[in-house]
């Protein structure tokens, strides 16, 4: 007879690293990691995902929507997740804006971080009777409205002195900006100022000197001094060439809190304000959103979770996502490998 000892075994290609014994050969493993491949971005399963701020606002940038460009007014859908598809938001196609002087480019991204966003139905200030008035509300051929007449941003009123009596230099004036949102939301109040060459400044405002502006809300105070002249003619989206520029900024007012704006000539007074609440998780990505995915990953796009861990590029991800690990993980589902048993000699 032949007597065999040991267990049935075969060659084992599986090696796992253990905490106590280092590398160990085992008879079977279950892979716990995957290495994703890049894919398009998708809607996050089980939640609303926002791409463009206003999907139905055609030929509009998100900054157009955020500022209330006349032909870019529409509903911003609620969303628990948002795609930051403009890493550096493009300009608005209305009046030429001096973007680099303020944080105006950040406004669309600020709005994107809220779950619910709506524009107020009425104005926060009566611009025509504001201090330093009476004013007429200025419009521009560079900002055509829906009937192709002259228009301007819905979030601001261009306060131009109404008659020669108040078309003069003025000491700084202050206007209070009340809180008008009705559901305890954050109020995002947009304001700004216009400046031009000396000739146009005298024609519009009766003063060609640099003007001073200050906003204050929620403990944040910002100061500006306008630049006079030195601007080349510039047209936006085929509008009329403009020698002037506007500077646009915003302030965030918490529930019930009043803000203030101190200004001289050329002020763009706040009008309709954004009322925003809830949080939307924001991730850098690209449009369009195609289909659905368990996870949105900045480097790989939409991922469906097939394993609990992944290797590859480590980046921000939202949703039901695998966990990043540096090296592949395996779960041993067999026994420690033993070499084939040797046969004992026949007796």
Curated annotation (Swiss-Prot):
Subunit structure: Homotrimer of disulfide-linked HA1-HA2.
InterPro entries: Capsid_hemagglutn, Hemagglutn_HA1_a/b_dom_sf, Hemagglutn_influenz_A/B
Stored SUPFAM superfamilies: Viral protein domain
Name of the gene this protein is made from: HA
Positions of glycan attachment: 25, 59, 145, 166, 304, 333
Note: Major glycoprotein, comprises over 80% of the envelope proteins present in virus particle. The extent of infection into host organism is determined by HA. Influenza viruses bud from the apical surface of polarized epithelial cells (e.g. bronchial epithelial cells) into lumen of lungs and are therefore usually pneumotropic. The reason is that HA is cleaved by tryptase clara which is restricted to lungs. However, HAs of H5 and H7 pantropic avian viruses subtypes can be cleaved by furin and subtilisin-type enzymes, allowing the virus to grow in other organs than lungs.
Subcellular location: Virion membrane; Host apical cell membrane
Function: Binds to sialic acid-containing receptors on the cell surface, bringing about the attachment of the virus particle to the cell. Plays a major role in the determination of host range restriction and virulence. Class I viral fusion protein. Responsible for penetration of the virus into the cell cytoplasm by mediating the fusion of the membrane of the endocytosed virus particle with the endosomal membrane. Low pH in endosomes induce an irreversible conformational change in HA2, releasing the fusion hydrophobic peptide. Several trimers are required to form a competent fusion pore.
GO biological process: fusion of virus membrane with host endosome membrane; fusion of virus membrane with host plasma membrane; symbiont entry into host cell; virion attachment to host cell
Alphabetic keyword roster: Disulfide bond, Fusion of virus membrane with host endosomal membrane, Fusion of virus membrane with host membrane, Glycoprotein, Hemagglutinin, Host cell membrane, Host membrane, Host-virus interaction, Lipoprotein, Membrane, Palmitate, Transmembrane, Viral attachment to host cell, Viral envelope protein, Viral penetration into host cytoplasm, Virion, Virus entry into host cell
Name of protein: Hemagglutinin
Organism: Influenza B virus (strain B/Finland/56/1988)
Post-translational modifications: In natural infection, inactive HA is matured into HA1 and HA2 outside the cell by one or more trypsin-like, arginine-specific endoprotease secreted by the bronchial epithelial cells. One identified protease that may be involved in this process is secreted in lungs by club cells. Palmitoylated.
Membrane topology: Single-pass type I membrane protein
